């Protein structure tokens, strides 16, 4: 019977302690200390949520009369006791001696006496997180007799000193979000089974860490020291580490050899420190032969560091002061797939034409929010996602994208691109392009030569006054078209403007100067955004060509009572949303003669300029 009960016991433990487990090697629990990541990073970056060893989806019910159980707690015959969140102010004194897994989280405990724990010699998991425990209230000998303890959770308390001694059987320890200033040699030392240690969000400085903090604990795989006051990388780190978090500290340099023994390290987080070019040398990262994820964002670097490991897949360098990418610093990293260089001080001349040569796996490049005055030459040939928004680019040349055949998403928004400076053949090679964003530029007309295979086209907040005949010709695969915030008038949108858009599902012409619902819209259209225009009427035939509409947005126009013909919507069998808020406040909707004449003159002037 003992063997048959072992699995149910394992399947009960710790679900009551905090929820689902994340895929880390050493199951632990604590606070999240991980930044918000883009979807592409999730393949390489596991969250810092310290998961518990989740072993069941059911909480233990209060045990039968034969099982002793403290008041308001839930107990099981297998030794699982849950006293979490019941406003305890004292350690429960009537715990069953066979307790294996004890949860006291989310209470008001301020102290624990050693004798209260000493009789629980079978205890394997102790969850004390989110209480009011102080170092004075947790004596050094508190855990002395817990020789079977594997998992200890003390996050979110008021500890200033770590316990001098912790049991040697520990697998995972969480001290996150305390006020720790001191770690002792045997706090984490001499624990061969220890796999994960969480110390983020404390007040640890270099002097508070012993030189041999993990002596005899060489199997630690996860170490989280983020958000402390460290100026140096801790010495003698465990060689088994595969995840090391040192972000949000005060690191200015990394001494030679700091990472030389960490050949198993896969993820290294160094963002939000004070690292400079001088603080890194050519060998800082060279021995990290397994490193796939490196985050150096939000430091003080002025160039891409040399000597980066060849194994890197994702490299964060954003939010520095980088002005140059030299010819040979990235080219050895043949596994690189994601390069994030946004929010730096890069100009096109600072990026060497050979900077990306040979990087055949590099498919995502972020260069936005820099000082690029043109598209850099020598872009990675296999790039699929290229973000160059928020720069100072004034034009697109014929050869700028001549070698990026695999490009699928191109964002050039919020630059200074004008229509005369955009070459008609600039996109001729982009036959795989699916998304093109030209919003926030200075375009007066839609660029000629738009890729025919684009699914999403954004030209919001430009200076478009008209859609030239044939501007959207051949774009049968276009699904979404955004023309928000331009100067488009109804006279400039003839029924032939949309004739080739057989697949269009979403059209956004909000924030223009339309006075009527556009004619000749494609039957495929499902969502039509017309808010913030000057539309004064909806006639009966307004939507005759668009029977598949699901959403019509007409808020904040000049519709008046009686100017909307109800029958206009009767044939729209799929209509789910009709938004006409912010209308019906203009009397009968008629304009005075002066206003009409003024608008006609403006239209004539703009049409003349366009010609």
UniProtKB/Swiss-Prot annotation:
Tissue expression notes: Kidney. Expressed in podocytes and likely vascular endothelial cells within the glomerulus.
Region (Disordered): 585-611
Record's comment on post-translational modification: N-glycosylated.
Domain called LRRNT: residue spans: 60-97
Gene3D superfamilies: Ribonuclease Inhibitor
InterPro entries per record: Leu-rich_rpt, Leu-rich_rpt_typical-subtyp, LRR_dom_sf, LRRNT, SLRP
GO CC, alphabetical: cytoplasm; extracellular space
SUPFAM superfamilies per record: L domain-like
Any single biological process term in GO: negative regulation of cell migration
Keyword entries, A-Z: Extracellular matrix, Glycoprotein, Leucine-rich repeat, Repeat, Secreted, Signal
Signal peptide (from-to): 1-23
Known glycosylation sites: 215, 282, 411
Location(s) in or outside the cell: Secreted, Extracellular space, Extracellular matrix
UniProt repeat feature LRR, residue ranges: 98-119, 122-145, 148-169, 170-190, 193-213, 219-239, 240-261, 264-284, 290-311, 312-332, 335-358, 361-382, 383-403, 406-427, 432-453, 477-490, 503-523, 524-545, 548-569, 574-583
Biased segments, Acidic residues type: 594-611
GO molecular function, one term: collagen binding
Family designation: Belongs to the small leucine-rich proteoglycan (SLRP) family. SLRP class V subfamily.
Subunit structure: Binds to type I collagen.
Function: Negatively regulates cell proliferation and cell migration, especially in smooth muscle cells.
Official protein name in the record: Podocan
Source lineage: Eukaryota, Metazoa, Chordata, Craniata, Vertebrata
